[in-house]
Amino acid sequence: FASLKSKQHSDMLMNLSEGQDNRVRRAIWNALRNYKNNNDVSTFLQNVVSTDSKYYSVSDAFRALVAVDTAAAGKKVEALLVRDSHQDVIRSAAISFFGSVKSDKNYNRLKELASYGGTTWDARPEAVSQLSKYAKEKSETVDIFVNLLEDRSRDVRRRAIYALASHGDKTHLGHLDEVMFKDPALGRDIRYAKKRILNPPKKPTKTPVEKKLEEANRKLDEIKRLLD
């Protein structure tokens, strides 16, 4: 039960969502991410995305759909990119598709979305974060982050700083110092990035399977707490 893998448990989760408040339903959508290639879960999540009136519920359901059925998610992404919502949570969820489903086409789309005017003010930071998923195989992405340190949006600059924290090196410390001088409000983020560059974290010892199981258990515990 803990790994949330059997069809019985997916049915239980979907049925459990009936009549629940939005917090519980969103926790269930997140738990359903574990049912990759499950047609029933895919159909269920597609229906939530298409019919739910709650912005955050739609956002979480779509992110879960990306994990469960990328083809189905791909058919909905364009419509969600033009759908307005509180703090642009739906548009941001749609943008996450291009980082979760890696391809040259999706990489180029993210570069467009991350550029100034590429999408709305609130959604652009998500495009920057998703671009960071390509940084290892496309080294030129790091240069994009450096250029974004001069962006007009502080949130975009902040995401670029965090991207450099993970993918930058000592040659980028000067760029970070320059941002610190121009915008001291980002000082905490810059100090974190510099510390991580100078002292990179050790690689995790947990296997992908162990991490996935741990995440599934965490989501189940969250649902139980919300229902108590």
Task: Label every PLM stretch briefly.
Residues 42-43, 54, 87, 120:
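Generic structural signal for alpha-helix starts
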Residues 137, 152, 162, 183, ...:
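Intrinsically disordered, low-complexity polar segments enriched in Ser/Thr/Pro and acidic
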Residues 144, 175-181, 208-216:
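Alpha-helical scaffold repeats of the Armadillo/HEAT/TPR superfamily
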Residues 187, 191-228:
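Pro/Ala/Gly-rich low-complexity, hydrophilic intrinsically disordered segments
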Residues 1-6, 14-18, 23-37, 47, ...:
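Structural detector for internal amphipathic alpha-helices that build alpha-solenoid repeat scaffolds
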Residues 10, 38-42, 74, 107, ...:
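Core helices of alpha-solenoid repeat scaffolds
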